[in-house]
Structures are given as C-alpha cells and as structure tokens.
C-alpha cells in the first residue's frame, strides 16, 4: 500500500472549439458547478502559452493520489510548485491554468493559494485538465485531495507521570504556561470546567460537508472529539499539562472527517500566526490520519523547520503507520496507543498502527476526559488521538521547563526516559516486530538532572525491495549526527552497509544481494554537542587475510564499523571485526570487503567495546551498554554460518543469524554481538577505553 503516481496527457484542442472560444466576449463570466462566479479572461495565446500546445512538450510533473480509493476526493487538487518558486510566480501559474482551462471550455476555481508553508494552490477542476496542469511551469507535482479522520473510538496519568513527579508544578507561579498548543480537530466546547479559560477558539474553519442528507448537527456531538482531547492535554483534573493554553482550529466536521487540503490550510494558518505575532514554544497536535500524502508530510516538515513541534496520531487501522499521513512524516512525533496493561490497543477488528514510523506508544484506551454533553460531564474515549494528546501534553510540560529544547532533543529525551520492554510484541505482525518500538511514554525528568548525557536513537529505512542492485537508505534528523550504520536482511543475502554523503547529508545505506529478499538500513542517530565526525575507508586488501581500518586523527574515537562487498561472495561474507587481538579500536574485515570506520571527536567523548558470545545454537545474541554509557555501534562478529545483520534496540545491540544449530559448533565459532558504548564527559578528553 502506498501512493500511486501517474502522468496524464491531454488531447489536442479541436479547431471548432478554439473558434467558438475566440468568438466569446472577452469579459464573459462563467458559472461553476457550485453556482459561484469567477472572472475569466479569454485572449489569444501568447508565445509562452502556446508552448504547452506543442505535441513534443512532455509533462515533467507527476500526479499523486491516496492509495485508498474510498478516501479520494476527485475534482479537488493541490498543485505543488517547486520550492524556490516566488509568490508572484505562484499567482501567475494559477492564473495561467485558469486561462488555459477557459480556452478549452472548462471553469476552474482556485480555492486557496499557499505562500507561507509551501508554494502552491488548491484548485477545484475537472480531472480532464490534469494533463494540462502537469505541463504548467514551476509545477513539481499535483496531489488529489483526500479525507483524514479523527482517531478515536484516570490510569493514564499515573502511567505517564510517575508519582514522584505528580507533586511538581510545571507551570509558572500564577498557574499559566508559556507553551501554546494548537489543536487541529473538531470544534470545542470551551466552557467545560476542565478547559474553561484556557482555550482560544480561532476563526479558522475548513471542513467538508457531512455525509447524508438527513445528518443532524447536534452541537454536543460536533464538539465531542475536540473537547475530549483538549481536556486530555490541559484539563484541570484529567489533563496532562494543566494550565497550558490551547488554540482550536476546526479541520474535522461533526462526523470526524476532514480533508488533506483543509489540514494544509490549517497548518499554514499556524505559520501565518507565527509570523504576525511571534510567541513562545508551539506544539501542534494532529489527532487525525489519512492515506499517505506527500504534500501533507512536506508541510509538516516545513513547519517543523520553524521550531514548531508536531505530534500526530499513528492511526487506528492496525496497519503500518508509514502508509498514513501525517504519521509517516519524519519530522512528526508519531504516537501509537496502549491500554492500562501497557499492551497495544484493540478497537474491534482494528487497533493501533505500528512500525518504524511510530516513535513511541502512550495511553489510548478508555481515557476519561471532558465530555461535550455538559460543562461538568466526563466520558471515556479510545484511540491513537488520545495517545497523541498525552504526548503533546508531556511535550508542553518539557518545553515549559526548558523552552530552548529542539524537536530532536524532545524526541530523544522521550525515547530515553520511556518505559521499555513492557509491550507484548506478539500482537504485531511478525515482519513488523523488529521495526516497532517497545516503549511507552513517561514524563522525563528535568534537563538539569540529566544534562550532558549522550542521546541516541535507532532509525530504520524502508525495505529496499528484492532486486540485486536494490539499496535502502536511513537518515538522521538535521540536528543529529550519524555515528554508525548497520543492516539487516531476513534472508541473510546482503552486500553490507556504509555511510555516504547524499545531498550534503551523511546517510546510512544498505545493499541487497543477488537472491536476496530485500534489506533494511539501520542508522544510529545521536545528539552530541560540538561533534566532528569523519569516515575512514579501506578498500578490499585482496592480498592479505584481513582489511583493517582505524581512526588515525588525534583525539578521534571509533563509534561504528561497517563494510560492503563490491563483488558478491556470500560464502566469504562476514561482518567486520571491531578489533584485532593486538590492536583494539579498529575495524578489521574480510580481505574482499571494503571496511569503513566512523570516527568522531567531541569534548569528553570516550568509547569502548563490549562483547557477548554464545557458543551453542542461537538465532540472536544481545549485549547491552552499562548505565551511563550509550550504544553507538552494533555488529555481529564472525562465527555464525550466515549473519542476518545487527541493529540497536534502545541501548541493546542485537546480532541476528540464520538458524545455525550445528552440533559440531565450537567455542571458537561462537556468535558474538559487539557493541560500541560511548559516553560524554565534557570535562575529560576524548579517549578510547581499552578492555
């Protein structure tokens, strides 16, 4: 499941139709299907406009739409222009499309023009004009509008806020907060006792009509979802971040349905508010989900670049969250839902989404919160919307303590201090268990109590696909440093992994092999102040038994090892050794492999290797870094018949091998998981710890 892309072609305009259009009065007005009128200007084509009529002109833009047919909204399209397009060019492009359409007897309506979040415009038009629109100058792609949905069907506060922290107040002495949360949802009953005086109802309203001619808009029902979530975020009694200010933007109708375009306009509204009246830290809660949308993910990325923290529901479809937006946006903190037993939420035949796009889970089952039935009523709701609201509240509390925290720091701290290994992973599909995080959110302690700790997380790539030349790429956030790269293949057929530069950013790339079923790249992404990293490469030695590489720059320490094979040789394939017996602190690989050492320098950075081996049959071996140390690199050392790969799970290195239950295995053939553990002590010098 994903997006389908296609390029549309239009047919040449007939001479008779062209003559008819030219005979029409220049200032005539056309009526669209909604009964609204729009000024259309018909004129002889200019030399520039006539270029589009050349048969040789081929559209370079692409057309995208939701993979779920029932969620599509044909006839409404977001025309996305190149990132560097200027405001005047956006207006000219929209006007040109109107002009070209009018010559062909079509009326289109420009519903909204985007300037502040991305260059583009929302247009209502016939699908017959898509081929024409794709040939417009500056157009990067066109995305058909689609639906998004609300994701909902006092143990929760006890779970995410430890008892010793519940007595602390995270707001200022007068009970206020400098953090503002924007909620994109249904309307809200702002007079409820839980949130009274804390909610600002904006004049923003961008929702589709409700389905069904007999639908009755009951105010309390229309406000239900938004009121409940507002109470979860900042309610007086049932809220997480008590005292936090909320701004309500209505993007979901009374049935809990909205559109991608309405959500985009809502995000741009927030950006405009930022520009007009800069304020303190902003958190945007997106308790909704629709099919994968490139433009919605891009809009989230652009808003995140301005310092806004976005928190999104993973979705309630018991499916891979990467297939939905905004959950799949890398710049969004994506939240799945658990119940009171810290297990994945089941909602009838569906349940919480999962997979590599989920950052962590939070309470999302039978959550007590404000009800819109009356100003003192309460009700329970379930879903990943409620889970996302909990994390939005936690983020607001963290920012209220330390407004300077960035998105990368917030995410890393949420991961570090989450409750780990409590979820029964058997609930998830087998192929998703290794990708899905086993973490439930809790409120982290203040930064003063944990300052200086090296923070790292694991980022998985999408699956590469099965072709022999297929690759997979995992990327860190711009603020993070890529300290190591590894790979994993369920078939074991892979040509290794390496760190390389793409578009000015270091990325982790994994290579599939002939006969392989695909591969994952696994990046270890860390926050390390004043770090300077470089990759040292050694090509295949060929003549010698091993290929060694080490950190030769002064004060640089080894944080990761990787290798790759230029020529496939599965019989000889082995992971790189992290050291030889006489020379610790270097990567040593097979003579036919190119070996890469990730070497970094930062004030007080010190690293060491920790190993654990099993001589008998084993499908996986693990080794963990001690308290105070952070895992930066993970490898499986030779000994297994065929290693499937290695990856980091929080602070644990996991080495996976194909079932190697041979009775004649010896201790020298033990499968070994090797972890590189580092810590940052700013007062000390960078060093390698010999063990």
UniProtKB/Swiss-Prot annotation:
Spell out the Pfam families in the cross-references.
Answer: Inhibitor_I9, PCSK9_C1, PCSK9_C2, PCSK9_C3, Peptidase_S8
Name its species.
Rattus norvegicus (Rat)
Principal location class:
cytoplasm
Q: What's the protein here called?
A: Proprotein convertase subtilisin/kexin type 9
For this UniProt record, the keywords arranged alphabetically read as follows: Apoptosis, Autocatalytic cleavage, Calcium, Cholesterol metabolism, Cytoplasm, Disulfide bond, Endoplasmic reticulum, Endosome, Glycoprotein, Golgi apparatus, Hydrolase, Lipid metabolism, Lysosome, Phosphoprotein, Protease, Secreted, Serine protease, Signal, Steroid metabolism, Sterol metabolism, Sulfation, Zymogen
Enzyme Commission number: 3.4.21.-
Q: Which cofactor does this sequence's record say it needs?
A: Ca(2+)
Q: Which residues carry this modification: Phosphoserine?
A: 46, 687
Q: List the disulfide bonds.
A: 222-254, 322-357, 456-526, 476-525, 485-508, 533-600, 551-599, 561-587, 607-678, 625-677, 634-653
The UniProt pH dependence field says: Optimum pH is 8-11.
